[in-house]
């Protein structure tokens, strides 16, 4: 996602500096050009050689390193950078930047940067809550630094409270959100549904399906990365929810119907990737249903058809995309669903096809519109999400 992007990773003198090494590695896996700048105090916690080995670039520490190229190094790097992040950021570095002090390689470079700048504080809770530190954070925010709030947890000083550097995965998501994609969906409101529904028959048992929500979550995440204002209405899943997205949890098909239809009128794009139950128990027992005999009959009734309702109430200019999971006659069944429910596009896949089932990290999809069908090869669900959004934006014009 970060191919061709240059990321400055500033590392300061904190016990959390070890996390920066993993972040550097994760950025390299995203194909970023990672330029690490350490303060002198940071070198007491991590050896610069570690970062040089992980990034393939020289780790900068000394502003007056004589082994420099002709360009004024901190200015040249600042001009080249697509994003700068200091993680961990000590109270000392934040105070310097808040007041415009430039006495080392990191501060001089950051003050020259015009790219997005992120600060991830890590320190003792009392230090973080100190009014002077908080004032400095406000100054940094007013000067277009984005502050990544620390987490609450057990700290190196044996205290417990705010001041813990977020996980590297969280820091990476902040970076990806800023520079991974062009913001071609900025200003659009997008509603995505994902995951299964659960239809209770008593306090213990329920009817559900094998959906994990991976495809819908990938779509919601890609919409967010491309600048959209995203609402994700999701059934219960075990996978991590995408960040920077408005999460609306539901359990039953009725709850999903209410949450989706209530929000639908204000959406520009609706992508319904959830696996919603078609039927639910006609009655729900207040007590656990006991075994009685060798057989049991469960009376079912139809659930609300969310996609049909959305198609019937689609506002002018709104784009409606559905999903179709089939085991046979995939194209015929999906075309019929597209027409019957007044969709702009339907994404079809076959459960029996290798790599396209529930719970996989890959998918094999066919995008069907009233005018054409586009079949794609096996790819990751993240890649498939990008292809789906590309097609939606093309069709919207």
Q: Where does each model-flagged region fall?
A:
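A cross-family phosphate/adenosyl-ligand binding-site feature
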Residues: 1-118, 124-213, 217-397
């Amino acid at each position: 996602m970060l191919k061709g992007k240059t990321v400055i990773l500033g590392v300061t003198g904190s016990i959390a500096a070890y996390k920066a090494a993993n972040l550097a590695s994760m950025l390299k896996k995203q194909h970023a050009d990672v330029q690490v700048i350490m303060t002198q105090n940071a070198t007491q916690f991590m050896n610069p050689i570690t970062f040089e080995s992980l990034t393939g670039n020289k780790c900068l520490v000394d502003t007056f390193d004589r082994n420099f190229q002709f360009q004024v190094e901190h200015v040249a790097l600042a001009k080249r950078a697509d994003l700068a992040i200091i993680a961990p950021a000590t109270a000392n570095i934040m105070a310097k930047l808040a007041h415009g002090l430039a006495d080392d390689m990191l501060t001089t470079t950051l003050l020259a940067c015009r790219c997005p700048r992120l600060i991830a504080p890590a320190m003792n809770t009392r230090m973080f809550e100190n009014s002077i530190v908080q004032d400095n954070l406000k100054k940094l925010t007013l000067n277009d630094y984005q502050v990544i709030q620390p987490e609450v947890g057990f700290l190196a000083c044996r205290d417990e409270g705010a001041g813990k550097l977020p996980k590297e995965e969280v820091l990476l998501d902040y970076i990806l959100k800023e520079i991974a994609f062009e913001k071609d969906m900025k200003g659009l409101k997008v509603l995505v549904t994902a995951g299964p529904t659960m239809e209770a028959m008593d306090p213990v048992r329920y009817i559900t399906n094998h959906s994990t929500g991976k495809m819908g979550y990938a779509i919601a995440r890609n919409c967010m990365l491309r600048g959209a204002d995203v609402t994700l209405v999701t059934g219960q899943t075990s996978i991590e929810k995408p960040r920077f997205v408005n999460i609306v949890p539901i359990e039953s098909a009725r709850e999903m119907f209410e949450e989706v239809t209530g929000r639908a009128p204000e959406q520009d794009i609706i992508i319904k990737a959830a696996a919603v139950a078609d039927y639910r128990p006609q009655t729900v027992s207040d007590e656990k249903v006991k075994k009685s005999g060798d057989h049991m009959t469960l009376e079912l009734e139809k659930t609300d058809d969310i996609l049909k309702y959305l198609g019937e109430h689609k506002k002018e200019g709104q784009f409606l995309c559905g999903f179709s999971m089939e085991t046979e006659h995939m194209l015929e069944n999906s075309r019929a669903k597209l027409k019957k429910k007044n969709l702009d596009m339907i994404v079809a896949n076959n459960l029996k096809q290798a790599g396209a089932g529930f719970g996989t990290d890959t998918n094999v999809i066919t995008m069907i519109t009233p005018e054409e069908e586009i079949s794609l090869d096996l790819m990751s669900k993240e890649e498939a999400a990008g292809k789906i959004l590309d097609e939606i934006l093309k069709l919207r014009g």
